């Protein structure tokens, strides 16, 4: 994450590319009362904290002792003072008191302890600022928050203090003698950097092992910054790789060294020269002579120490990075040489040149646990004790150890933590950036990582270079005041981390053998198979042919949103760091999530103009151009264009451990959620070479859990078996039609049908409809079971989800009119079915397969005892997906007539096979009575299903009826009489009118509402015949009467008998009907928080970029979907399990067992060893106060990567409230909406903020005030 300074505004960008916060760099255009946000004041990103921080800087700048200081240095001092004031304040109100801020500040600054610690900082800062315009620059490493003295610019006072206080000059200069010889920018380009050099004079003022330092892991994560597409045209230094100044940001996991910029009189422009006697010309000839001698002596000592290891492991280093290699050497431990190898030097070495003619060496983030331990800091500072313990344990287990840093990144979806090893985040380009301004120096900003609950969200780490448009972070300064207890850290690009987090992260560090880096050069054959295990990609389970097919299709499946750039040459033989070596593309963009208009709730055109309301630098809401034209508050909206470009997020990357090349995670089919710190990642090309050389075997298929390994049910087995039989028959028909044998005709392979969700739900009847039929005792709710069924197909050895449908099953225990009814709610598919050929009947073969799945499901429901099925054939609109997120661009969305024809062909097949006995429309079956119908038609007889069309329409009609005036009611009564006379119906006149209005609404689109009869219905009473005997007309087709209606038929006059339109009457034949079975589900309940609702599943895919617009993305999305499915259910009993108590296999991916199965079967449950995660997190129970505080936070939080679980929950609740048709009405309604309104009312009663941003807060306050006034007037 980086910040860019444009026209006095510092804008911070999260990894998603969305602006998260904007603060004025100068001036106070808003008062604190207008922008108070008290919910996150414990964070540095708080607006209130930012205001007070800048006020502190303003006051400091007014003092004489700080007037000559650089502004950035004052900002860091102000930050530390602000943190101290916040921690020591009795309350937030006292901390926010701006009137007493100057007094409190002066009390701190005038204290003796503060002034004593600031003495040497002030001298160094002033000296640096005075000489910044004259002196060149060199970079010197700082070990553990301690700056090694520079050659000639260290003030004498600081040098003397270092000497008199017992500083070990050898230890203090060891790192400085071996700094990375990369020249900094010229003074005229970056003068501010020279003014920020601060020296810590003695050990007593050293900060603790920085709990405030941000994470910069040394794994394989790479971050693309703005300007990646213009590497050859920019003159700015790079910061995205290990050779950039990002290496100056300290790694809190490894306590690696940082770089600080120091001016000196002269320095050779030759890169890579050692500070030795042979290079005396590099050192200044005036002043600090003893210091120069110390540098030379230290260099000679380290060369002596490292000579033996240089000879033994010369292949790992180059001449250009000899100094960097020296920095890894440590004194003897237990009589042996130790070498710190956090990562291989060749992974990070290499350099890149810019237009100024200088080069930078790639430096490694060295793990300094051993150095820290040896230099005597662990005994003095409590924050380093975990490091000491880790090193002590490692020394006991191995004579030569290294630290393997891990970067736990939270997975909100499963509650797990996985290391961010090998990942890199691609940050999209900054939007609306002037190219001239892009060449200016940019100031570092507070690092904010994109950490969504279900997306690959990794923290920023070292990465290969290729990002020119960035600034050096080498001027960071760290100091502390041990009297006041403040950590005064000048790290603009870091976030605050507590000491507790530091301890926890260090406790996760795994120590391994340092000689493991030599295995890659020596092992071969069988021994190669015994190295680190794989498991991060499903490609390891593929054959060589499948791998080749997968690689061939990648070049054809790149998205149209790609950013074309020229192919860059590799550096020092390494692969191009900005190009995926699998697909050959650079930066690929995901399809942005759709924006909905806040007024009309329609999707805003992604390529057109729209308007946004900005609050605190973030987009609060968006409206379309049409609503903006009709809006009366146009001033508060800003016009924007094409959010398809501004909202798009770039694909993530991963680096191969073997060839060091970078690939898109999607191309590599890499699953970042199951990365094992001990596992290695090998790209497809390297793995294919190993397979061709017979050096390695692919994983066993059982170790990669795919669609076949999902739990089977009777429903899925029934559909699969029926589909397999029908495909065999269809293939034979194609062979006969083409005159070929069956083997010569292509067949369909690799299909898998699975039920991924089967959850019990309850549908609440909308209150107006319920009250309308209060006399008829209409039920208030309908229980049903929601099921999600998916179809997978093996495509080049990888599962791809092709088809999804959600159904609602109202069983025999459900009250009428939904008893024994099935509602086909949603159907969705993507066009990746293979082979793409025609069936024997002339339709597409994929259509044949989808029809057979639906017919198979209806057949299964019929056998279980269901009697009817309703379907609403409503096509989805563009970018408004039903189930699968983002469809291919080549797939056309069907219009209403096409979709209607598709369902009609389905029904014809079902009728032909006897699955459906009669096909009707909802209008003809219930709303349009025939002469044979002997019962009163009522709206209460229509099946009332969740998210169906007509229940919402009926509620709207009843709501409109309640709003009519008394004058209109007289007209309405006359209309009722006319309708009753015309239709000749009996019953409630209002019910008749409601049916009439529904009929008028459905008549023009009645073909879109199908009513399929799976069993015979009585033509007189319209009830299904579920048991006993029935009577069928011998002359008419499908004319059945139940036993009761047939008895009434015999008692009616002959002229009124069937058929009523003719004089000749038909005879009936008695048929004995077997009673229908109860609809009890034979399959177990399978609940999943991601798949129980199609809204939850769709949002889960949107949040995690599980898209299906290309085949490569469909493969990766399916892989992640399968991972979540396997990870959330027990592999033995297939029941939902508690993730905190799950037992997991370390070999088989996604193989998890619940605690009950493990207690029952133990180790015999699985062939491999199972391990239970010990540091599980207990689910948090929220109180009312938590919800109220979370409501305020969620209403102001526009960060898509917010890690607060309660914030995400409440945002989902708001989203549900917008879409819900049931809502909270009367004494019933949707229980989620009821909870939301109760929460809003409770908040409004307690809220005293006139400008509260919580939803409907002001409206509820006005409503309460009106009610209070009304009550007072009545009582008065």
UniProtKB/Swiss-Prot annotation:
Keywords assigned: Activator, Acyltransferase, Chromatin regulator, Coiled coil, Metal-binding, Nucleus, Repeat, Transcription, Transcription regulation, Transferase, Zinc, Zinc-finger
Residue spans, zinc finger ZZ-type: 1013-1076, 1125-1187
Annotated positions binding acetyl-CoA: 827-829, 846-847, 902
Functional note: Acetyltransferase enzyme. Acetylates histones, giving a specific tag for transcriptional activation.
Reaction(s) catalysed by this chain's protein: L-lysyl-[protein] + acetyl-CoA = N(6)-acetyl-L-lysyl-[protein] + CoA + H(+)
Gene Ontology MF term list: chromatin DNA binding; histone acetyltransferase activity; transcription coactivator activity; zinc ion binding
Residue ranges of the region described as Disordered: 391-421
Broad class of where this protein is predominantly found: nucleus
Annotated residues for binding of Zn(2+) 2: 1033, 1036, 1058, 1066
A Pfam match: zf-TAZ
Keyword Cell cycle: no
PROSITE patterns: CBP_P300_HAT (PS51727), ZF_PHD_1 (PS01359), ZF_TAZ (PS50134), ZF_ZZ_1 (PS01357), ZF_ZZ_2 (PS50135)
Binding residue positions for Zn(2+) 1: 1018, 1021, 1042, 1045
Subcellular location: Nucleus
Domain CBP/p300-type HAT, chain residue ranges per copy: 704-1130
GO biological process, one term: positive regulation of transcription by RNA polymerase II
GO cellular component: histone acetyltransferase complex; nucleus; transcription regulator complex
Species of the source: Oryza sativa subsp. japonica (Rice)
This protein's name: Probable histone acetyltransferase HAC-like 3
SMART domains: KAT11 (SM01250), PHD (SM00249), ZnF_TAZ (SM00551)
EC primary class: transferase
Presence of keyword Ribonucleoprotein: no
